[in-house]
Amino acid sequence: MVKFKSTEQVLKIIKNKDQIRNFGVIAHVDHGKTTMSDSLLAHSGIIAPSAAGQALAMDFDKEEQERGITIYQANVTLHYTQKEDEYVINMIDTPGHVDFSGRVIRSLRAIDGAVVVCDAVEGIMTQTETVTRMALEELVRPVLFINKVDRLIKELRLTPEKMQETLASVVSNFNQLLDTYAEPEYRDAWKVSIQDASVTFGSAKDKWAINVDVMKEKGITFKDVIDAYSEGKVDELVERAPLADAVLGMVVKHHPPPHVAQKYRIPKIWHGDLESDIGKALLACKDDGPTIMMVVNMVLDKAAGSVAIGRLFSGTIRDGQTVNIIDAKREGRVQSVNFFMGNQREQVGELGAGNIPALIGLADSRAGNTLSSIAGIKVFEGVSYVSEPVVQIAVEPKHPKDLPRLVEVLKQLTIEDPNLVVKIDEESGETIVSGMGVLHLDVATHRIQDAKVEIITSEPLINYRETVSSGCEAVMSKSPNRHNKIFMRVEPLEPTIGDMLRSGRISEMKDKKEMADLLKEQGWDTDTVKRVMKLDPRGNVMINGTKGVQFVQESTDSINSGFDDAMKEGPMCREQMRDCKFTFTHFVPHEDAAHRGLSQLGPASRRACMGALLTAGTSLLEPILAIEVRVPTDMVGNVATVLSSKSGKVMDMIQKGPASIVTGEIPASETFTLSEEMRGQTAGKAMWNSHFKRWAEVPKSRLAESISDIRKRKGLAPDPPTVSEFIDRE
């Protein structure tokens, strides 16, 4: 019998860490994550059992319920009883749509296990692979729930034997992901198996599930499942095999408790001294160790203000406690410690290591921050996002008086969602909002309107990047007063280092020795590493190549400022630069400090960088999306025709049941009218999704037109600037 546990009872159970599990639900969009999660909530008494599968209680944002997809990650604390043992299970339901994959990545840092939900008919899809890879990179152990088994019975009308064969094929394909992405020591140990009940089958919509353990205990066979549907006895099947028993039983059996998981996860996500007292406390998940927590999500609550949600890896967090927000180099006071029961926040006073607290009062905290009772400790490794903001819109208030309110709302949105980027265009004064895709931006604009700010938005536009494919000799630029000379050259930066900068693995916020070691691992010599002047998170570097020159040290900030300005907006189209390695080779400064301040050296540095880029020759990069289309087999040719007309290409085609899955690539700039054309060519029978795959050079056939279009919409002169506008002669 389901019994709802009070907060006091839950707190009593979690004193024993063996009784805690932290897991997330991850999946391809529309494979049934949130519907499954509802059944688990009903089992714990948080929603009515009759509403499970319909309430979408984990989609407690109005936008989520209207769209029928999960946009935010929602976390909840569940109670589960297995025979005589009681467990507290912290569950996070994550978005499935690729535009919100950043939220999935941050959630994975907080959990130790993942239930991967997969449609029995569609099988392993692109986003299934992506989220599973993310989980394995975070050393989060996956188990598999094959959902929508009712489709095999009602749509495909499979026999028990054929049904088992189909399910076994899904399991095999899933294990291939582990062969590809799991670290060697876990590759075999973490493979899922029907025989050990790390695979569960069921229907989240109909609220039943079975695995080997349930089948043995209840005497259920696949024939019984088919008979339940053919004889209209699904309710009896639900009574014998409720979904929550099978799924939560699988979680308890195969996912580790926090003190076990942290022994192998901490060395991966925290690069401090593991032999220190701090390191030992993290590895052991000690309640009496220093308080150390990583924030994975910020929620703005109308009543409580900022709520910082994260994983407490060490120590105990209490109401009224002062913590150091390490990344921000500030202190904050925890007003109250809470956990979530659905969309209800429960104040608990304190929580120990291994839990997922929700802290009120830390307004200066952001997702990714490390909180600690000890100042100056090593921060947790940053999370690596699989995509970048590639689509943008311009936003302005319909009524000018609402501008301050719009600025405030946008600030709140970027606190909640670090993948949303807001900037002011200095030329036009427009507010530009960039996101992972059109849906991401659509949701953001709805949030602004929900805040009672009427806005006008532009059509969505693609973000581009600029880079260099070759190097150049040093060029010279003078300051506005003509009294200072800066010499600069550029060459391509190793892509691996660019990726490490963008992921935050290499950062000026990190320990200098650790940064030096990482750069040496990439082949840089000791002297070059010592001379790093500036690390740009967009994926660019500046090296100090000067020798025996006066005033370089005191001029560094000004020169770095000019470098930063050049990296924000490259010379070709004023798009961000990436993968560029600059060397500041020589400096001829004015002797009087009054003549070599920021107003002089900043512009000179920017001009020198721009001159070097144009001398080397810049390339324009566009985002390329991977696309996956599910379509009736006789319409595969129509899909290929659409992709070809959009400068895309088909990479592969496989048949799955009555349909075929076409995978390919397409430039992001060609996707704005793709829905209409795909519907027209396939009579509305195609279902497709796409996600960012890589940056690629714009083909010469489209380059001139692309440059012209970008410069025109930015209000720039038709032609890019020339080298002579940035470099000076002796």
From Swiss-Prot:
SUPFAM superfamilies (alphabetical): EF-G C-terminal domain-like (SSF54980), P-loop containing nucleoside triphosphate hydrolases (SSF52540), Ribosomal protein S5 domain 2-like (SSF54211), Translation proteins (SSF50447)
Residues bound to GTP: 27-34, 93-97, 147-150
Pfam families: EF-G_D2 (PF22042), EFG_C (PF00679), EFG_III (PF14492), EFG_IV (PF03764), GTP_EFTU (PF00009)
PROSITE patterns per UniProt: G_TR_1, G_TR_2
Compartment(s) where it occurs, according to its Swiss-Prot or TrEMBL record: Cytoplasm
Record keywords: Cytoplasm, Elongation factor, GTP-binding, Nucleotide-binding, Protein biosynthesis
GO MF term (any one): GTP binding
SMART domains found in the cross-reference section: EFG_C, EFG_IV
Tagged with keyword Hydrolase: no
Positions of post-translational Diphthamide modification: 595
One GO term describing the cellular component: ribonucleoprotein complex
Region (Disordered): 711-730
Keyword Transferase: no
Segments forming domain tr-type G: 18-238
Biological function: Catalyzes the GTP-dependent ribosomal translocation step during translation elongation. During this step, the ribosome changes from the pre-translocational (PRE) to the post-translocational (POST) state as the newly formed A-site-bound peptidyl-tRNA and P-site-bound deacylated tRNA move to the P and E sites, respectively. Catalyzes the coordinated movement of the two tRNA molecules, the mRNA and conformational changes in the ribosome.
Family: Belongs to the TRAFAC class translation factor GTPase superfamily. Classic translation factor GTPase family. EF-G/EF-2 subfamily.
Protein name: Elongation factor 2
Gene name of the encoded protein: fusA
